[in-house]
C-alpha cells in the first residue's frame, strides 16, 4: 500500500481549485500532481489486460478519487467553467485527465443536460479508447439521468447511423 500524505495532497488539490477557471494552467498543475504520485517502480503483470490503451500515470488507486472529491464542490458551483475545463482535459493524451473530465461533467446541474448531451455526442463521434468510454458512461451521465434525458440520449445514439 502506498503512503499518501493527505495534508500535502489537500494542498495540491487546493492549488488545482485556485486555477480551475484557467484550463491550461489547471492541466499543467494536474500533470505536476499526477507526476508527483506516479509509481515508477511498479510494473503490472505482463499478461494483465490494461484498462486503457491511452498513456497513463501509474498511480495509487485512491489518488484519483481523492482529487475528484476535492473538486466536486467547485465543479457544482461553476458549471460554465467546468464545461470549458472538461473540454481541455478531454484533449489530453493521458487517461487520468480524461477520466477527471468525465467525472467533472457528471457534477453539472441538471439544467446543463442539453450542453452535456451535445458534448458527449461530439466526443462519441470520434474514435475513443475503451477506458475513456467506460469513464464517460459511468461518471458523466448523472445530469442526463436527473433531467430524464438518459433514455432518449441512448436511443438517439443507437438510432443514429452517423455515430456508429
Name each model-derived stretch.
Residues 1-164:
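Alpha-helical scaffold domains
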